[in-house]
Amino acid sequence: MPFIPHSPEEVREMLSVIGVQSIEDLFVDIPAEMRPRSFELPLGLSEMQVLAKMEEMAARNRTDVVSFLGGGFYSHHIPAAVDALVSRGEFYTAYTPYQPEASQGTLQAIFEYQTAVCRLLDMDCANASVYDGGSAIFEAMMMAVRATKRRKLVIDEAVSPIWRTMLASYTSNLSLDLVTVPQVDGRSDMAAMKAAVDTGCAAVVVQNPNFFGVVEDFTDLFAHAKSQKAASVISVYPVMQSVLKTPGEMGADIAVAEGQSLGQPLSFGGPYLGIMTCTKDMVRQMPGRIVGRTNDTEGRTGYVLTLQAREQHIRRAKATSNICSNQALCALRTLVHLCLLGPEGLIRTAELSMERARYAMERLTAIAGVRPLNTAPFGNEFAVRLPIPAFEAVDRLTARGYVPGFPVGRYYAGMDDVLLVACTEKNSFEQVGILAEMLGGIL
């Protein structure tokens, strides 16, 4: 529908009908000193001028760099078929499937997505997703609070600081007791977390691999939490789950993930995907939409939104969350991506990423003054200490077309010299070699 402004005659007619003389009369309730005297808007531009302006702004983005950035968001290859299939109109423009008789295709796609992520994480149930990895952790924490009727939450400092900042914002007015257990050289302090998880604890929250890329086994911690009747929440990197011990094998009650690495392109601000799974015992605390499969009176398979009494369109303030829009299109991208790769393809993606990361660790730590932050096992990401501030290394190499990683000191005190380096299947061995040569040249 085109935007056609009202003519002056139409404006006068509308003002006359409502009994005012001018548009300004509509704002008389706003004190004059609070009204802007002028918006100082520039004159309008032609279509060609607007296009040129947008291209000028877009050119400020660097798209020609080789990146080793990670920290929870990774540049994996996305098959072209993902965009081709997801952009079909029946998916791209579909609305929330409240009417199952008219939405079987959308509902089945969500059901298949739920099935896929449950198999990947070895959990019982999944929802249709939430906004992103950070909101998924928050919703998991609130599930635990509702289930246990407790207010204390223990969170590992090695959980992404980006997500922990989100949690602080989400919970600022909820009267929750967030206890952060300090990490030790990028590793989880298991003993300290066990000590913090007591009979007053609602949940313990961890990440695997953690923000520093370290792979941990939380089986004992989760068993201890269960003995205290506290829930176990784990955030995972879904690509690495194809080769690591699953949340289900560790005994997690709730497993969540940032789903960006499965079919979502890197984008500042998203949209991304919050994967949420849990055990059967926790499913009624799950927020968002859940699709179930059943048979109708004629024996035909049908898909419906199930357990809807949890949702805000049924219970309003008493719902498990106020999520009203979901990331179903992003969830579909993840489903298509997983189906195109298959189990072997996903495992191969993880293996290639890990091979390159191990080669990068060998090459970088061979440089004088560079040493690993710890000796723990890692997946496709690791942290090293440099003889200069990591910010300086990032700035100098980025200017030359290589982003060497993420400066950890941005979020962790005392780690200004720590660089977080991530590799995916898109980073070649040649690129890793060039990175090592460039880094060695400035140290």
Swiss-Prot record:
It is an enzyme of class 1 (oxidoreductase). The keyword Cell membrane does not apply. GO terms for molecular function: glycine dehydrogenase (decarboxylating) activity. One of its GO terms (biological process) is nucleoside metabolic process. Its EC number is 1.4.4.2. Belongs to the GcvP family. N-terminal subunit subfamily. This is Probable glycine dehydrogenase (decarboxylating) subunit 1. It comes from Nitratidesulfovibrio vulgaris (strain DSM 19637 / Miyazaki F). The gene is gcvPA.
